Amino acid sequence: MQHTHILIIGAGMAGTRFAMQYAKSRLSAHSGLGIDSQGEQSQDEFAITLINSEPYAGYNRIMLSPVLAGEKRFAEIYLFSQEEYANHNITVKTGCTVSDINLAAHQVITDSGETIGYDKLVFATGSTPFILPLPNHTAKGVMGFRTKADVDAMLDIAKNNHNGKKSPKCLVIGGGLLGLEAANALVQQGAKVTVVHGAGYLLNRQLDKTAADLLQTYFENKGIEFVLNANSQAICVDEDNQVTGLTYTDNVDTSIPAKTIDSDCIIMTVGVRPNIALAQQVGISCERGILVDNQMRTHTPDVYAIGECVQFDNQLFGLVAPVYEQANILLHTLNEQPGSTSPVFSIQPTATKLKVSGVALFSAGDIDVSHDCEQLIYQDPSHSIYQKITVKDDRILSAVLYGDVQEGGWFFELIQNQQDISAIKDKLLFGKAFCEELLAG
């Protein structure tokens, strides 16, 4: 009989997905076991404990934007039900924080003083929003956009006539994916929203300026205001330490005097930082994240890490695709049989889709590469369609699509495979079906 207790710190998307995958794999193996030499049913016993500091476990953070917008209820975005956890030998402890770990004894200690043993320990502690260290950054009304508590706080301001105002003012710092999702959702809840962004155009890591301008026009038509090339200087507060606005300067023309935007709350969407404090505290090797190898093993025996708390090959991970792949790799690592070879984790190109109703947007590959490259461009201004494919040595380096993204999956496949497109390059923007017919003819 083999008994394994997996203890997972963090019940977010990475932790809960791994827990369920591991449980299903062990239960499947158990169902196929035969009779042992004593004539008894062979057993492969296991238990999984998920510990989460939030009062909720296993919800889809990607869907917090629709919850904020009022398009979904929070109850609809749970990844698994309580019954599913129970049926898969998974114990979930919410509102519980691991305060210390005895690595030698294979035990964790919680904030309530409980000691829990483990055979294998998995860090899935995720990340926390980065709050710009501006003057008054701890004031009431300054928040990130990461948890249900953040959503509840924003809804309280946007929907409940904050300070008696029918249309409260919300300011979002950061014009990336998360910031735009938050801004769009808050507008739908009746707030007046301004997005302050440090770069000269939105989504500057995923788009070029042409696509970004189309996107900005779309949001402006919904009532969102934008301040670009803005360098946030200080958060303004009243006598109760409640946010009243933001002071900023122009980071291009420094001769322009500082300006202030009035606001009832400030949402920071300027990136995240891996949550590694506990790992550092107990001596697990960390740099910007918890260091792991390509099988998700840390430098400490029987300790593993997956998700946004991880650093691999000097990279951090904030998208769901690599996080889920890490969970899959760890599953194989822990189920590896003697003499077998487990798959390993590697960094792959990722694609971006904006999760805002009415926006068709796709970006993949390295959009910053331009030297010695060809750019294939199609534009239809009357229908707000823009497509740009960047090619070098007859291989696609990146794709930016706005308005019509139906070929995004195909372009992404060509980027991943680095396929030679010389035979179809001139017709590439006509789409997959046309190009395949061209090659067949």
What residues fall within each predicted segment?
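FAD-binding core/adjacent interface of flavoenzyme oxidoreductases
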Residues: 1-9, 21, 37, 80-169, ...
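Rossmann-like NAD(P)H-binding beta-loop-alpha module
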Residues: 153-207, 243
